[in-house]
Amino acid sequence: MTERLRIALIAHDQKKDDMVAFAKAHEQALARFDIVATGTTGSLILDACPSLSIQRVKSGPLGGDQQIGAMIAEGTVEVLIFFIDPLSPLPHDVDVKALTRLGSVYDIPMALNRATAEKLIKALD
């Protein structure tokens, strides 16, 4: 039996609706993965897609980004989809930079916007 790929879903506040729409559009494909998400993003996705099983960690500003970064470093998260809002100032910007840095260091597939996420989910499906 092969292990399922583990994918992380994260979205900044102004991008959460877009992440929910992405999850709804790809609910069947996402159901084939183990999913981890930051707290609020995970809750919103679960409300819209109750068939998905999502492990929720803390909210991003409360350490959730760092928790997922640790999972990337440990090799337990293999794909990152993170809808970043480049136009809003973020008090936890250093956490965001650290998370995307780890995605690059560990060379995992990483989508930081909807257009790239659409291509990535199709490639993984």
Swiss-Prot record:
Keywords: Lyase
Keyword Lyase appears in the UniProt entry: yes
Top EC group: lyase
GO molecular function, one term: methylglyoxal synthase activity
Transmembrane regions listed in the UniProt entry: none
Bridged cysteine pairs (disulfide): none
Positions annotated as active site in the UniProt record: 65 (proton donor/acceptor)
Annotated positions binding substrate: 12, 16, 38-41, 59-60, 92
Annotated Gene Ontology cellular component terms: cytosol
Residue intervals of the MGS-like domain: 1-125
Protein function: Catalyzes the formation of methylglyoxal from dihydroxyacetone phosphate.
Family recorded in the similarity comment: Belongs to the methylglyoxal synthase family.
Protein name according to UniProt: Methylglyoxal synthase
Protein's organism: Brucella anthropi (strain ATCC 49188 / DSM 6882 / CCUG 24695 / JCM 21032 / LMG 3331 / NBRC 15819 / NCTC 12168 / Alc 37)
Gene that this polypeptide is encoded by: mgsA
